[in-house]
Regions:
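Cell-envelope/ECM-targeting effectors and their regulatory/trafficking segments
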Residues: 1-82
Length: 82
């Protein structure tokens, strides 16, 4: 599940990158349906993630910083569980 951390995604976007984002959020424990559509539930999950890890900018847009933080946290979890 690779997603380009230089892109950004927001409500209304669709496609494989959104599926990857939803999968990553799900791996981190957020209740998101992997549909490939950046819907309201996905936006709420992104906002919740941002609220926890980047409280200075909670906008529901999966930007480069949000995606990089999510990748980094999942890498840490993977190395801890290995």
């Amino acid at each position: 599940m690779d997603i380009d951390a230089s892109s950004f995604f927001q409500e209304g976007d669709e496609g494989q990158p959104i599926e990857a984002l939803q999968s990553l959020l799900g791996l981190y424990g957020y209740d998101v349906l992997v549909s490939g559509v950046f819907d309201e539930k996905t936006r709420h999950a992104v906002e919740a993630f941002q609220r926890h890890f980047r409280p200075t900018k909670v906008d529901g847009i999966a930007d480069a910083q949000t995606i990089a933080t999510l990748h980094g946290l999942l890498k840490q979890l993977k190395s801890i569980s290995s």
